[in-house]
Amino acid sequence: MSPALPLDPIETASRDELAALQLERLKWSLNHAYENSPVYRRKFDEAGIHPSELKTLADLARFPFTTKKDLRDSYPFGMFAVPQERVSRIHASSGTTGKPTVVGYTARDIDTWANLVARSIRAAGAKPGDKVHVSYGYGLFTGGLGAHYGAERAGLTVIPFGGGQTEKQVQLIQDFRPDIIMVTPSYMLSIADELERQGIDPATCSLRIGIFGAEPWTNDMRQAIERRMGIDAVDIYGLSEVMGPGVASECVETKDGPTIWEDHFYPEIIDPETGEVLPDGELGELVFTSLTKEALPIIRYRTRDLTRLLPGSARTMRRMEKITGRSDDMMIVRGVNVFPTQIEELLLKQHALAPHYQIVLTKEGPLDVLTLNVEPCPESAPDATALSAAKQALAYDIKALIGVSAVVNVLPVNGIERSVGKARRVVDKRKSGQ
């Protein structure tokens, strides 16, 4: 068996060594943003703070937040901090409304990104000679190219498939026999469905490791994927505004939440309502400051992702708890805060039902109605009695454990539209009156 790929030396540095590096790089990043981005200069001046006032890492809390709105208001290149001729690549995330969020990279930024995704792939257990099947979308989305260049930087063979064409994906997985797949967890389930449709047991295919990201997914989902595919499933975290995939990633030996690559990104957890910085271990909104980015430095960027910071385990760098949801993904149903991942956890306990689901929110007069569309599990082939029992049990659990009533509809197999990227888990029709 080939040995695992070696770690970067910084991954085993002491906390004191890491903190010293973070402070040095943080001072550079704040100065770079202030001196070269008019948007940041204005924000800092309005807040009455200057980069020279940062003496300790804790002083970062005195600086203003950056939000997605800031990026959209400066569309397309208003927050860039280098001349256009130094921008080597542009990516963008579309969002649901309005103009896309545009991010830029210098050649050095792209080099750093490739190194961090390579580090993430090594942390997942990659070995020399491994082949990586990339099913993230290519193009303006950061997933495909981020995974691609990271796998190449790690010295691995890349199969640059991209999203969609599930039958073709399965054919190439069978023919090319990749060891690693990088994809959204929801699309991994679609690939597993297609393998089974073709009469192939997913656990017999060549894949050894799945590196899953771009959408929240639960530990119950991890166990379901691992059981079905016969692989190690690890979580990679990132967002285009901060860099793309590879901001943090799980280590295969622990699978206890993504390790944040703290030599390039400084994390904070804040109270999403007050903006107050919370101590490690408390649940709140994740905030990132880039320490080395040139084209688009990010200062205290509010990700809207909800998690908590935890001590390092497989590495000395801190971990983040698996994302439980986003503050802007939260549904308020009859006054109760509900996250899709809560419903997912309950669904996965019903073995007669598949892990595919969609939540539809409507109004019945003044009252909210939550409808949960699910499918039978093809593997267990439940009869009508088993499906009825699972449906009733799921509705009971949602009411008992989350506190809202749900109408559970069992659709035919493949009755829920499959996504080649991020799954559309929630359809809110309340405002439209549909």
Give the positions of each predicted feature.
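Active-site phosphate/ATP/adenylate-binding loop shared across adenylate-forming ligases
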Residues: 2-8, 63-234, 242, 246-252, ...
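AMP-binding/adenylate-forming catalytic core of the ANL superfamily
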Residues: 181, 287, 291-402, 421
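Conserved beta-strand termini and adjacent loop/short-helix elements that scaffold enzyme active sites
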Residues: 161, 236-238, 270, 362, ...
